[in-house]
Design a protein with these regions (language model features):
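Regulatory extensions appended to serine/threonine kinase catalytic cores
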Residues: 1-15
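Eukaryotic alpha-helical solenoid repeat scaffolds
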Residues: 1-3, 130, 136-252
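"A position-specific structural signal for the A-helix of alpha-solenoid helical repeats
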Residues: 14, 48, 82, 117, ...
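Structural motif corresponding to the intra-repeat A-B loop/turn of tetratricopeptide repeats
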Residues: 22, 56, 90, 125, ...
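Structural marker of alpha-solenoid helical repeat scaffolds
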Residues: 38, 72, 106-107, 140-141, ...
Length: 252
């Protein structure tokens, strides 16, 4: 690129993007300035400056750049999505949420990234139901759908403290494409909570009525499954001990 003849906008943009990739911020700033010297209305230069500001974690500068780009291209959602991210990272979560909502509801191409942004913002604010609703926006045809299901499962497991919530979380970890070790860990957590809740009438979990003994059996199985999958010797020993502690013993 340094040997390219002239300094056309295309060459300068390519130089700027290459500088961004290699964290060469001064070179990027030079490319941006040359672009703006040639054309003060070159929105691509301002966009590039916004990307650089994000990389430098200068979120107010990123917001200013992306807001300026949106002002020049009011019908485009890309600068609005970028502005939402800059606001999110800069702590302006209310504005970020509003921008993500607009992106998610305006163009199908932006639903997935906007939905994940909404989920992050709402999770940060402690709005678990709102975060789950955002993740549910991700279409089944999207490449991000499996990730959305994993995120839903993780949030449901973390929040599950009563019988209906534990039941819903168990269904979610079955439906999501999770690694076996993650399924085992989540199952352990959920059956530990279920064991504390189950009474004489049993407990309804994922479409089944389980007795206290059956819950203990499921918990023991989760301990042993997780023990078989972990590479950590100390953790494996603790899990096996926990499984043995709840196994029903009989004298022959």
């Amino acid at each position: 690129l340094e040997q390219a003849p002239g300094r056309s906008p295309g060459v300068l943009l390519a130089k700027g993007l290459a500088a961004l990739e290699f964290d060469q911020h001064s070179r990027l700033a030079d490319a941006v300035q040359q672009l703006l010297d040639d054309d003060p209305w070159e929105w691509r230069a301002v966009w590039l400056a916004g990307l650089d500001a994000l990389a430098r974690q200068d979120y107010p500068a990123a917001q200013s750049s992306f807001n300026a780009v949106y002002g020049q291209l009011p019908g485009e959602l890309a600068p609005k999505l970028a502005l939402a991210l800059a606001c999110e990272l800069g702590g302006e979560t209310g504005l970020a949420e509003s921008l993500y909502q607009v992106c998610a509801s305006t163009d199908a191409a932006y639903v997935t990234p906007a939905a994940f942004g909404l989920a992050r913002v709402r999770t940060t604010g402690g709005d678990v139901p709102g975060s789950l609703a955002a993740l549910a926006l991700v279409p089944t045809t999207s490449r991000g759908y499996p990730e959305s299901q994993r995120a839903i499962a993780a949030q449901l497991v973390a929040a599950a403290q009563d019988e209906p919530a534990i039941s819903r979380a168990l269904t979610a970890i079955t439906d999501a494409r999770l690694e076996p070790v993650v399924v085992a860990e989540y199952s352990q957590q959920l059956y530990e909570r279920a064991a504390r809740l189950v009474g004489p009438q049993g407990i309804q979990l994922a479409g089944e009525r389980l007795t206290a003994g059956q819950v203990r059996d499921r918990l023991e199985a989760a301990y042993r499954r997780r023990a078989s999958l972990t590479p950590d010797d100390a953790l494996r020993a603790r899990l096996v001990d926990a499984a043995n502690a709840i196994r029903p013993w009989s004298l022959l």
